[in-house]
Amino acid sequence: MSNKMWGGRFGEGPDRIMEEINASIGFDQRFFAQDIRGSKAHCRMLAEKGIISSEDAAQIVAGLDVVLAEIENGTFHFKRELEDIHMNVESRLADLIGAAAGRLHTARSRNDQVATDFKLYIRDTIDHLDEQLADFQRALVDRAEEHAATIMPGFTHLQTAQPVTFGHHCLAYAEMAGRDRGRLADARRRLNESPLGAAALAGTSFPIDRHMTAAELGFDGPTRNSLDSVSDRDFVLETLSAAAIAATHLSRLAEEIVIWSTPGFDFVRLTDGFTTGSSIMPQKRNPDAAELVRAKSGRVIGDLTSLLIVMKGLPLAYSKDMQEDKEAAFDALDALSLSLAAMTGMVRTLTVNETAMRNAASRGFSTATDLADWLVRALGLPFRQAHHATGALVAKAEKKGTDLDGLTLAEMQEVEPGITDEVYSVLGVDNSVASRTSFGGTAPDNIRAAVRRWRDELGS
């Protein structure tokens, strides 16, 4: 029995194992909307150029509308023996309209067809992710406005460093999400060239109009080299790279939420909706949503790495290896989308323990830098000398079992005789935070101004 798709070249059908390893319909069926959209554009162009009749084109477009409706309402039957979404759609089209369906593939290969489908899919997905990232930013900005003056410890090395505000911390992640949106927008701009009409690899002898199909599909224009058109997966790699960075940002916040939820910190409390219990320990409230966001970032990074490895040794133009691009992309982008939804929900609904945050900020000598700065401003000491004196005062306070403001003036003057009682005005966390007025600093007024800028930018 000859193969139905490849015609007379083959005397018998594929081995069962070959059919199984070769089939992609189990995952590329999610291209159905993009595949049908691309086929309609190609069909209309063929008719416009006189390559097929307008009557055949009308039948094809009407038949594709029926196929689309069947897939959307769940009555379409996908067949593994037809390999992929392209042949499943074409086969059903032939059932519906007969021989005219065979004219659709004129001047087209599955190589340029799948590249077109994939670009349309990635473009649609980028648009969806951008909306999710913007919603995530809005959630962060809302919490930043609410907690513009809520003092918490800022950390380096997960050790108390300087007091900051929780609003400032939230806006740090809004900045990260903004860069993520920028990277995805850059990827979208670069991918927005249509490979349709490149055919298998060398172009076609039919008088097609690639500019027409590119315009109908919303591309900026056609790709300029047919070999590159069908072998390019940079647009997937670039999108997955941006996705991996975004997932890494979410993972960092997830890690902080996990830490902050522990009794040792007690900075935040997730709602019951984003936690789980234990089958044996009745007291447990586990931050599983945050932990899963943290874990899914590893999957996204792994999917990017997987696709890079698939592509690294492929000669031009198309190789079947490239069928392995889709599952990695689907998995990564699905994981990022779900992680964004979960993280946005957690940010919107978590409860902030302002007392615990403030108490933690007041411990660990978090105003030591403020003391050093005061020594520079009030006494004219070089910063390095002020830094050394402050370190000695920290050691003295640590030995005494108190914070810096627990040292007496006499004890401070043992280290630096010029210190006056004015020093106590800079040792409180409120004054410390309020003094950080440099652009981008943590002062509450800065945070409120930043919130206004973000609301203008996000339209909220």
Curated annotation (Swiss-Prot):
Which keywords belong to this entry? Amino-acid biosynthesis, Arginine biosynthesis, Cytoplasm, Lyase
Entry's InterPro entries?
Arg_succ_lyase_C, Argininosuccinate_lyase, Fumarase/histidase_N, Fumarate_lyase_CS, Fumarate_lyase_fam, Fumarate_lyase_N, L-Aspartase-like
Q: What is its main location?
A: cytoplasm
Quote the catalytic activity from the record.
2-(N(omega)-L-arginino)succinate = fumarate + L-arginine
Q: Which GO terms describe its molecular function?
A: argininosuccinate lyase activity
**The keyword Phosphoprotein is annotated on this UniProt entry:** no
Pfam families, per database record: ASL_C2 (PF14698), Lyase_1 (PF00206)
- Where is it localised? Cytoplasm
Q: Which domain of life is it from?
A: Bacteria
Q: In which pathway does it act?
A: Amino-acid biosynthesis; L-arginine biosynthesis; L-arginine from L-ornithine and carbamoyl phosphate: step 3/3
SUPFAM superfamilies associated with the record: L-aspartase-like (SSF48557)
**EC numbers on record:** 4.3.2.1
Which is a GO BP term held by this UniProt record?
L-arginine biosynthetic process
Q: For this UniProt entry, what's an example GO CC term? A: cytosol
The record's listing under HAMAP family reads:
Arg_succ_lyase
Q: What family name appears in the similarity comment?
A: Belongs to the lyase 1 family. Argininosuccinate lyase subfamily.
- PANTHER family recorded for this chain? ARGININOSUCCINATE LYASE
UniProt name for this protein: Argininosuccinate lyase
